[in-house]
A protein has these predicted regions:
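Short, basic (Lys/Arg/His-rich) helix/loop patches that form interaction surfaces
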Residues: 309-348
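Conserved tyrosine-mediated DNA breakage-rejoining catalytic core shared by Y-recombinases
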Residues: 227-270
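Basic, Lys/Arg- and aromatic-enriched nucleic-acid-binding interface segment
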Residues: 189-222
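Short, charged phosphate-coordinating catalytic segments
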Residues: 145-147, 215-239
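N-terminal core-binding DNA-recognition domain of tyrosine recombinases/integrases
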Residues: 52-67, 76-166, 198
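Active-site/catalytic core of tyrosine-dependent DNA strand-transfer enzymes
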Residues: 266-320
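Catalytic-site neighborhood detector that most strongly recognizes the C-terminal catalytic loop/helix
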Residues: 350-369
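Flexible interdomain linker/hinge and immediately adjacent N-terminus
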Residues: 149-193, 296-299
Length: 369
């Protein structure tokens, strides 16, 4: 599908991995246990914070995805730093009045919006701010269910009654907190096949060329691609790649919805895949993952999402093309629609449970589809 010329692999210095946590009192650390990453929140004197770490363990036990647990860990570390700055504790928050609690959490939203939770005061999108606060609220709910703290007043459910035009009384349950930011409309520009080819040509190694080609050609999620085990998931006779659900991927890659499905590769991309494995047999020998880190102290470890985003950012500077894994997945869906694929086939290829999700994903209305 794409011209993925093989080139000699160049030596390059990887961008330093993003530091976990920030330079404030509380930060996130991860440890490997049973071949799975476990997240903890520790203080600046290297003490484990018991309550948030207990909650993160609970998320592991209910089989939340590693990325969900990681996201919750960072959100709670930010919130604990905010509490430290405000010199107030969890128990004191629960004693505040409704209006005081409401103000406290709105202030937290603005605090992360301004980037005070990061070392470099990097501003945060409304959607991400809301995600952080949602994680904090779920933590408070967990503590309430464990009888550690009373339920927050802003999280108590209110019942609202109203009469319709026929005089029938209805009751709806609504959450009390209304302070979430209005989320920005997604502004993800479409990417063209020419731009994808330009990105591939700008890559400095065969791994990145193959990764971009596969994302655009299969419609697989980034986590699904990074979770591919070349020893188990590739059918060399049928030219297919299988998505498998695994909990133990050390790079946090996981198939969403615990699903299994296959993606067919074009002749060109499959030939490149085979040659990539053959040429990199030595470096792949100690790993079962198709995509691994190429240089540095972590050489040979499974490639993770942060490294992919860093790679796309470098390519953006070289080509002036802003790209994103989701953008490449959306490209796949749009191309299949143009080719006349049935909507259910597109749904299955994308791994959506409901066709309504696919319709929304394509940004189309029922009539046109």
């Amino acid at each position: 599908m794409y011209n993925v010329e093989l080139r000699s692999q160049r030596s390059q210095t990887n961008q330093k991995e993003r530091k976990e946590g920030c330079g404030l009192k509380y930060r996130v650390v991860s440890v490997l246990k049973d071949n799975r990453p476990r997240f903890l929140i520790i203080s600046d004197i290297e003490e484990i914070e018991i309550l948030p770490s207990k909650y993160l363990k609970h998320l592991d036990q209910i089989n939340a995805s590693p990325n969900t647990v990681k996201s919750a860990a960072f959100a709670l570390s930010y919130y604990y730093n905010y509490l430290q700055e405000q010199t107030i504790g969890l128990d004191e928050i629960t004693l505040l009045s409704y209006s005081e609690q409401n103000k406290h959490f709105i202030d937290f939203l603005y605090w992360v919006k301004s980037g005070k939770h990061t070392e470099h005061n990097t501003q945060t999108s409304n959607k991400t701010c809301n995600m952080y606060l949602g994680a904090v609220f779920r933590y408070y709910q967990f503590l309430a269910l464990e009888d550690v703290l009373p339920m927050l007043k802003v999280l108590r459910v209110k019942k609202v009654s109203y009469f319709d035009s026929m005089g029938v009384n209805h009751q709806n349950a609504v959450n009390s907190f209304k302070g979430f930011f209005k989320e920005e409309e997604p502004n993800l520009e479409e990417i063209t096949s020419e731009e994808i080819q330009e990105l591939i040509n700008a890559c400095t190694n065969d791994r990145d060329r193959l990764l971009i080609a596969m994302m655009a050609e299969t419609g697989l999620r980034l986590g699904e691609i990074l979770g591919i085990h070349y020893t188990e998931d590739i059918d060399f006779e049928r030219r297919t790649v299988r998505v498998r659900y695994r909990e133990s991927n050390t790079n946090l890659a996981r198939a969403k919805n615990a699903e299994y499905r296959m993606a067919l590769l074009s002749n060109t991309t499959f030939e490149f895949l085979v040659k990539y494995i053959s040429d990199n047999r030595k470096s792949l020998m100690n790993s079962e993952y198709l995509f691994t880190k190429l240089t540095g102290k972590n050489k040979g470890e499974p490639l993770d999402a942060d490294s992919v985003y860093s790679m796309l950012k470098r390519l953006s500077k070289k080509t002036d093309i802003n790209s994103h894994p989701h953008q490449l997945r959306h490209y796949f869906a749009e191309e299949r629609r143009k080719e006349g694929w049935d909507l259910n086939d597109i749904r299955f290829a994308l791994g959506h449970k409901k066709v309504e999700t696919t319709i929304k994903y394509l940004g189309e209305n029922n009539e046109r589809l």
